[in-house]
Amino acid sequence: MKTISRQAYADMFGPTTGDRLRLADTELFLEIEQDFTTYGEEVKFGGGKVIRDGMGQSQVVSAECVDVLITNAIIIDHWGIVKADIGIKDGRITGIGKAGNPDVQPNVDIVIGPGTEVVAGEGKIITAGGVDTHIHFICPQQAEEGLISGVTTFIGGGTGPVAGTNATTVTPGIWNMHRMLEAVDELPINVGLFGKGCVSQPEAIREQIEAGAIGLKIHEDWGATPMAIHNCLNVADEMDVQVAIHSDTLNEGGFYEETVKAIAGRVIHVFHTEGAGGGHAPDVIKSVGEPNILPASTNPTMPYTINTVDEHLDMLMVCHHLDPSIPEDVAFAESRIRRETIAAEDILHDMGAISVMSSDSQAMGRVGEVVMRTWQCAHKMKLQRGSLAGDTAENDNNRIKRYIAKYTINPALAHGIAHEVGSIEKGKLADIVLWDPAFFGVKPALIMKGGMVAYAPMGDINAAIPTPQPVHYRPMYACLGKAKYQTSMIFMSKAGIDAGVPEKLGLQSLIGRVEGCRKVTKASMIHNSYVPHIELEPQTYIVKADGVPLVCEPATELPMAQRYFLF
């Protein structure tokens, strides 16, 4: 049998089993665990290549072949790090394996035909589009920024650049919910909107869920009282939606213990669990140790650097409508910034104790930096804590799977939409991000929504080829016309769908139903299910997990930073 060197093979068809790649300029290295393609039968498009009539391309009609094929790609997902061809049909992933022409090739499980378009995945990394569960819908342009960072699903709330939305992720009431659903119908991104859960009687909550909300948000700026928490969770259990909470920083309605008592063992998604973004000061970080709580971070504190503390005070004053001339407002802001808990947050992520990463877009966080900051934290933790259990000097596969789950499958599980998005798996929407390894986590090579290209770096439009400078991200055809309705999804509760909200509002996007999110627990959080016993020293703010102090130094330098943004 003829053989070629590993280097020559990688240059032609991309790396294979046992090959290693560095992620961007980090100290993280992946190793390909399995190659689903067949040596000697690989398919590749181009002049003199395999995907031609009678060779890699069969004679079947469109109904019998995939619409889009990604060839020889390296998949990073919670379930593995593998090389495979990926088949897409009707906007969904239908195959992960070996593509080709079954008439002349063995082991083919993805059929290429005349109706198949090809995306060259050789040497590229493939990830699922990110799911950001902490979006303040302050401006519609966030969708573009999120997409070009690799995020394809927004969950949050708001109505535009007004005080309520600048501070809270809430779309309150039927009228606001309906107008925002009509608005986001035009965005080329998946969307779910939170209703307001800050009310002590059930009727005003039920009507928001029936109006099309994906779930509910409790926020201290609207009142995160024990009664509101108890009532909101009662309705959520009844109607199978998730509740997200930004708890009571000032401890006015009760302390951390009262909030836990009101939650009463029911599932709830706690935002910015460290506390700088809000929540019981200083105890909210203890929620990492509750088996029914799904803990999340927002990206302004991630990872802990020498600049993190200094930049937070001004951000807080703006986001929460505070007045620097009022001493009580300044004290409120200062109570939330604790370098000790910020340092502990990085370590809790690395231990798999904090399960989700999100942005807090334009409300302290940066909508386009969820992916980047996740991997910066992983890099920092490898340098400071060494390899994770199960990893070797050769690869960081376990750490990579842990961190990618934080912004893909786990937020999807938390909000009952993992049957539609959150991973590269058969049957799910083909929301797929392609990366050159050198630019992984920073600048995608291609962003696909529902199997179509939504955004891509594109050169001079008047050039003879696509690559001449200036190159920048531009919207592609999945963003245009009626195509955007067939490639993006609006998520809402079963109650909203049964009430006919999509039909009443004339929504044209795909409609996704929330399901099963009241059964999710911390144990459901893939690679991030650790439930430590958390202690916090109230004077020093030192955090302990199972008796071990969580202490680390701030980073003075990070990868995936200035060298990628010179132009």
Swiss-Prot record:
Q: Where in the cell is it found?
A: Cytoplasm
Q: Does the keyword Hydrolase apply?
A: yes
Q: Which domain of life is it from?
A: Bacteria
In alphabetical order, the GO MF annotations are: nickel cation binding; urease activity
Q: Which UniProt keywords apply?
A: Cytoplasm, Hydrolase, Metal-binding, Nickel
Q: Where does Ni(2+) 2 bind?
A: K217, H246, H272
Q: Which reaction does it catalyse?
A: urea + 2 H2O + H(+) = hydrogencarbonate + 2 NH4(+)
Tell me what PTMs the record reports for this protein. Carboxylation allows a single lysine to coordinate two nickel ions.
Parts of the chain that traverse the membrane:
none
Q: Which residues form the active site?
A: H320
Listed cofactors: Ni cation
Spell out the PROSITE patterns in the cross-references. Answer: UREASE_1, UREASE_2, UREASE_3
Q: Where does substrate bind?
A: H219
Q: Report the residue ranges that make up the Urease domain in this protein.
A: 129-567
Pathway assigned to this chain's UniProt record: Nitrogen metabolism; urea degradation; CO(2) and NH(3) from urea (urease route): step 1/1
Show the CDD domains listed in the entry.
Urease_alpha
User: Main location per UniProt?
Assistant: cytoplasm
Q: Which residues bind Ni(2+) 1?
A: H134, H136, K217, D360
Instruction: Kindly report, in one word, the top-level EC class recorded for this enzyme.
Output: hydrolase
Q: Which PANTHER family match?
A: UREASE
Question: How does the record describe its quaternary structure?
Answer: Heterotrimer of UreA (gamma), UreB (beta) and UreC (alpha) subunits. Three heterotrimers associate to form the active enzyme.
Which NCBIfam families would you find in this protein's record?
Answer: PRK13206.1, PRK13207.1, urease_alph
Family per record:
Belongs to the metallo-dependent hydrolases superfamily. Urease alpha subunit family.
For this entry, the protein name equals Urease subunit alpha
Annotated organism of origin: Proteus hauseri
Its encoding gene is what?
Answer: ureC
